[in-house]
Each structure stands twice: as C-alpha cells, then as structure tokens.
Amino acid sequence: MGMLFIFVMNLPNIARPDTKIHRPVVGMPGISVKIGDHCYHGLCDIGASVSAIPYKLYQEIMNDIAPAEIEDIDVTIKLANRDTISPIGIFRDVEVLCGKIKYPTDFLVLGSPQDDFCPIIFGRPFFNTVNAKIDCEKQTVDVSFGDESHEFNFSKFSRKLHEKEFLEMN
C-alpha cells in the first residue's frame, strides 16, 4: 500500500478567505418586448419551465391583437415559495417583438395580481426560441435568429418604459 502526496506550491494564496473576488450586485435579468401596441418588461427566469402572464395583461393584449381564446390546460405550477397554483389556461402563439424579430410564444395565464413594472415571466421555452444567452458578468441578455441579433443590457433596466424608449432600444 502506497501513499499519494500532492504538493501545492501556492496553497496559502489559494486557501486565504480574504482573497474573494467581490462583484457588484447583478440587476434583474430582463428584456423589453412589444406585444400588439404595448411595450412591457419581462423577467428572464431560467428556473421557470413556462412563460406566464397575469389575466389582466391577457385582457389588455386581447384588445390589440387578433382574437384568440385561452385554451384549458390541466397543469399545476409549483412556485419558488413552494405554493402551488393552477393557471386559468394557455394563450398560444402570441407574437412577441423582441429586438427586431417577432417570436411566437405560449403563455400560461395566471389569476394572480399583476406586477405593473414587470408583468411577464419568460421561461426556458422562450429562451430556446430566441436563442438567448444571459451573461451575468456583463449584465446582458443576447437574443438572436439567423443573422439578426439584439443585446439587452439589464444593468440599465429602468422602472419606466415608454414607446420612445422601446424604439430607441431597437
């Protein structure tokens, strides 16, 4: 039976707790999108397996786009705080303008109150569709389709979103 010794030359420098790299607090990863005639902020939640909107937002969107009904869906959602909710239904193939490209997106419609600043939650299926890359160090979300791409900087994610600001971002 032999023994294995591993010598680490710079062990004191590696193990020192006071050499931690401190980074600034990362902002909320979000993107600004347009649905119908309205601009919205959307939270990029890579932990979410679905995209979701509140019922109030669904009603707002319905007034701007071609009539589409909510389909019944037998799903229960488990939230981060371990609560469970059942959505009202699913709103399919909603055209979401993200950058300069419109992407079809399915949203679960929830009966929960609307967050006026960021009413939309974008989950992993949306990120797959838009080929999203989230970079926490640069605080950016890149979306692309073919040769077209757009970068959102969420360190500048403001609490106010107007049509003019949306057009400037694109």
Regions found by a protein language model. Name each.
Residues 1-170:
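Proline- and glycine-rich low-complexity segments
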